[in-house]
Amino acid sequence: MNSKISEIRKNYSLSSLDIGDIGDDPISFFQKWFEEAVLSEVLEVNAMTLATATKDGKPNARIVLLKEILEDSFVFYTNYESKKGRELEENPRACLVFFWSELERQVRIEGGVKKVSREESNVYFHSRPRGSQIGAVVSPQSYEIPNRKFLEERFEEFSKLYEGKEVDLPNHWGGYAVHPNRIEFWQGRSSRLHDRIVFEKDTDSSWKKFRVAP
């Protein structure tokens, strides 16, 4: 092992997490932590790792952006024909991970995934910068392309095509909502004795919470 890598470590000491102070609704508590991260000016606070897997269990992960927190789900948008989209089609489960190093906090969210309505996707799509809208139309995400010029020429072609007109929401693009059945809140502590509080859904859809060892 590279000795320089093995010696990299940080002692966590900023805060603590007590099960009695966390409430009974994990999504509300997530919103509280998210707002604290915003106030702390965490860089790209809504960036999250999205882990998916094929139907035979081959995993993949990438960074995407959270775009909405609902009462029962977390929403992001992407190309439905991308690698992640194809995996979610055949295996509609995912894990989201947020790591806010400035606050020494991590949140892990596991659950089933469903597409949001086309109406919701359309509203968000047209809130994006125009260049991003056209980019979503022209990019065959995750598929091999000959070179960058291929993308640039398609972008120029469709920019002219849509000049003075609204960009249509492409059929291959839209949102997903992750409906959690397990959420874990992690707070870094000294000596690696971190605080980990887990919420899991019972069969009656209520949440139970408990502490797990770090």
Swiss-Prot record:
Checking PROSITE patterns in the record gives: PYRIDOX_OXIDASE (PS01064)
Report the catalytic activity.
pyridoxamine 5'-phosphate + O2 + H2O = pyridoxal 5'-phosphate + H2O2 + NH4(+); pyridoxine 5'-phosphate + O2 = pyridoxal 5'-phosphate + H2O2
Q: Name one GO biological process term.
A: pyridoxine biosynthetic process
UniProt keyword list = Flavoprotein, FMN, Oxidoreductase, Pyridoxine biosynthesis
Enzyme Commission number: 1.4.3.5
Binding locations of substrate: R9, K10, N11, Y12, K67, Y124, R128, S132, R192, L193, H194
Q: Name one GO molecular function term.
A: pyridoxamine phosphate oxidase activity
Pfam families recorded:
PNP_phzG_C, PNPOx_N
Where does the chain bind FMN? Answer: 62-67, 77-78, 83-84, 106, 141-142, 186, 196
State the InterPro entries in the record: Pyridox_Oxase, Pyridox_Oxase_CS, Pyridox_Oxase_N, Pyridoxamine_oxidase_dimer_C, Split_barrel_FMN-bd
List the cofactors: FMN
Q: Give the cofactor note text.
A: Binds 1 FMN per subunit.
User: What pathway does the UniProt record associate with this protein?
Assistant: Cofactor metabolism; pyridoxal 5'-phosphate salvage; pyridoxal 5'-phosphate from pyridoxamine 5'-phosphate: step 1/1; Cofactor metabolism; pyridoxal 5'-phosphate salvage; pyridoxal 5'-phosphate from pyridoxine 5'-phosphate: step 1/1
**Does the entry feature the keyword Flavoprotein, yes or no?**
yes
**Is-annotated flag, keyword Flavoprotein?**
yes
Q: Which family does it belong to?
A: Belongs to the pyridoxamine 5'-phosphate oxidase family.
Assembly description:
Homodimer.
Enumerate the HAMAP family for this protein.
Answer: PdxH
Q: What does this protein do?
A: Catalyzes the oxidation of either pyridoxine 5'-phosphate (PNP) or pyridoxamine 5'-phosphate (PMP) into pyridoxal 5'-phosphate (PLP).
The protein's name is Pyridoxine/pyridoxamine 5'-phosphate oxidase
